[in-house]
Amino acid sequence: MSEFTHINHQGNAKMVDVSEKNISKRTAIAHSSITVNSEIYKQIVEHTNQKGNVLNTAQIAGIMAAKNTADIIPMCHQLPLTGIDVTFDWQENEQSYTLNIQTIVSTTGKTGVEMEALTAATAVALTVYDMTKALDKSMVIGETYLLSKSGGKSGHYQRQDN
């Protein structure tokens, strides 16, 4: 079993020293979702929400969240992100609609951007909830997970669907 890298010799939390790691291009792709009712779906796609364009605002929130991940996740390094993209795909269910969210975050650096991609995806879903909760508070934010990552010593990871 490998040692935990975020624990020092006294058993306390520490931020890992990455100064000896090689610089490489690193990319992470994350997924989240939010399921809404037909009234909220209609409001989002027709841009009639009183707070503004829901998806544009959520995209900006995701970008801001990725850029500020180190401020809210204690052991994350501040990274010079080189790219952040947020995309959406609607899935119609029997009596609801699911907004699938994908975030892609890239950097050229000494540590990966998985947490930035996951934080962005989560912030997007939370922003959609915040902007539409006046209509229905029973929305469900779905699973959030890492789809893939590339770069670094551990190489490529691709999530396998079960």
From Swiss-Prot:
Substrate binds at residues 75-77, 115-116. GO terms for molecular function: cyclic pyranopterin monophosphate synthase activity. The active site is at 130. Pathway: Cofactor biosynthesis; molybdopterin biosynthesis. The keyword Lyase applies. Transmembrane segments: none annotated. One of its GO terms (biological process) is Mo-molybdopterin cofactor biosynthetic process. It is an enzyme of class 4 (lyase). It catalyses: (8S)-3',8-cyclo-7,8-dihydroguanosine 5'-triphosphate = cyclic pyranopterin phosphate + diphosphate. The keyword Lyase applies. Its EC number is 4.6.1.17. Keywords: Lyase, Molybdenum cofactor biosynthesis. Catalyzes the conversion of (8S)-3',8-cyclo-7,8-dihydroguanosine 5'-triphosphate to cyclic pyranopterin monophosphate (cPMP). Belongs to the MoaC family. Homohexamer; trimer of dimers. This is Cyclic pyranopterin monophosphate synthase. It comes from Staphylococcus saprophyticus subsp. saprophyticus (strain ATCC 15305 / DSM 20229 / NCIMB 8711 / NCTC 7292 / S-41). The gene is moaC.
